[in-house]
Structures are given as structure tokens and as C-alpha cells.
Amino acid sequence: TEAFRVDPAATAAFSALRSALPNLRPLDEDARALKAVVIGGGTGAPVSIRTLLSLGVQTSAVVAMADDGGSTGILREEADVTPPGDVRKCIAAMAADPNDPLTKAFKYRFSFARNHTLGNLMLSALEDAAGSFPEAIAICEKLVDAQGHVYPSTLDHVVLSAQTQDGRILDGQAVACHSKTALAQVWLSAEDGRPPRPYEPALQAIREADLIVLGPGSLFTSIIPNLLIPGVVEAIRASRGRVLFVCALADVQGETWGLTAREHFEALTAHGMEGLIDYMLVHSKVPLRAESPATGSFAAISGAELEHASTSDLNDDQLIKGVRPISISYADMLAIQSRGPIVISRNLVDAEQPTWHSPFALRDAFQNVIKLSRARRS
């Protein structure tokens, strides 16, 4: 019924991918033995999780813990729990059967109950009943028969702060992600003011990974907050794994409003990832050639202007409706590659949901990255 809504997470697209799996070319045995870790938040990370699982890769996720909006924000404020929302989404993405009734119920959102999801309530209740958030995660992973593990990057209750490109300071993830101008930098602090402590199993998963995937998802409020936890960047550096950054298709919020793909890359390097990114996957409807900027195929339907621009003159209603494709030019591609990464450009847009990655295109791109990684290592 309408009272029980499944939380959206590209469910239909990845159901189609699951149905097509018997007819898709699998990875060889060596590739399926690879360990991958996805670093991100609750919207983009599940996309990479489902894609990697469809390839048979052993997959874990390290998840940002700065969420303070919506259902999670209410639970944090009123029950002082560890933020469950992004972890819940990644657990659901790990489920062996997305159509299992328990897995579907785990994603139900109740509009009549302050928009809480069952999964959020379960994680928060189990954190109290079992005595720890990691134990709550482990119980929920068993309930949905998760095919991998989800690790919070920290167990500390952290607050994200941001500085916009026009110099304003914003406190809170929910505020920062809807900024009216692009963000310049972000930082974390624990609620008692000290630096947050890393969750050691998350660091270990990163160190053991053969492939580390950043994104897709919100750059400053989902991906980078993980990198701000002491020890995470060092774990990436210590890993023998290749690092893939999956750039978002579009900015449908405000935090990266008007930023190009090159500026997304530069934001990562400014937050500790200089020299650590091996591959960058970007959307390009057409092959990148000299002096030919590429944009999302949804530019026409969004009406978005593609030049670098500020949105300080937009009101909230305009900001909410805006969808700005993330563009990349041939010159930007060369500039990125001059700093180390191989840029892989593909048409990645899902025709049915133009602001989502096509699971089939993403799967094919991931296969190629795995092959490239093995070739470079041998």
C-alpha cells in the first residue's frame, strides 16, 4: 500500500541487472577472487556494491557516519544513536535476494511515522539491545543474508562542517549538501570536540582490498567524510589495491553545483587523495576529443547550463528542481591524467532514470577496470 513505500535506490534498474545475469559474461576465477571495498555513503555506494556483487567480486563497504538529516537526524537527536541510514542502504544492497520479503521490509519507509524506515529503527533498536552498533550491523546482515560486510568508518558521533566557495561556514551534513553554492572544503569533529577515531575493521578491509571504489555519490558529504577519518587515507596508501573514483553523473543538490569532473577530482586530491587515484570513471555521451566538452545525455531535459556557475542567486525551489550535468572536456581529461589517473569515459546514463548510472554500463566499465588493474600489476 501507499503507507509502505520502499526506499528508492535504483531498485528497478538493478533488478533488471539481476535478471540478466545468467546471460552476461562472468569474470574468470582469478578475478572473482578479488576483494573490493566501496567507500561512500547511502545513495551512490549501493550502486557500486550491487555492480561488484553481480561480477562475483568479494565486496565490502566503508560508510560515512556524518548523516544528520531525515529519519537518521531524528534518531540521532532524540535517541543519541549512531547514524543508521547510510549503513542500512548498504546492508540492503548486500542482500542475497533483493526481492526477499524481509529485505523489502527492511527498506520500507513509513510516511505516517515521521518518515522513518524499518531498517533505521531496527539498527537503532539493536544497537541498544545488543550493546554496540557493529553487533547491530552483524545481526541485520544475517537477516538479509548479506553477501558482504558493511563497516562504519568511525563509531564516534561526528559532525560535518563545510566552507563554501564564497566563504560561508555551514554546520551539519544536511545543511551542507543543500548549499546554494559549491563547497570548497569539509571537516569532521567528534561531538566532544576531539578528532574522530577510526573503526579498525574498516581500515583492515581497506588495507586488504584489491580494488578500492570511491563513489558514486555526493562528493563532499558522502565520499570525502570517510577520507577525513584519521587512518583511512593511510590505509588506502598501504593497500596494494587499485583505486577507482566513479564520478557522479549530475548534481541534483547544491554541494558541487557547477563543478566539472576535473574539479571533483581536485576536491579529492585536496582532501588527502593526491597520487592515490589510479582510475577515474566519467560519463561522456560521445568520445572525448580535442576541444569537445562532454556532458550528460540528460542536459536537454534538465535545461541545465553547462558553464561553471554559482547558484547563490537561486531560491530554494529552483535549487531543488535543478539538475546540472557534470561536464568534462578533453583538456580536463588530459589535466587529470597528467596527475596520474587513467580517465575512462563512457556513456553511463540509465535511459529510464537519467540521473542514475546504467547498471549494465557500470558493470562493463568495472570489468574493464579489473582487467586493466591486473594487466598493470603483472
Regions found by a protein language model. Name each.
Residues 43-49, 221-228:
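Short glycine/serine/threonine-rich phosphate/pyrophosphate-binding segments
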Residues 17-85:
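Gly/lys/ser-thr-rich phosphate-binding loops in alpha/beta enzymes
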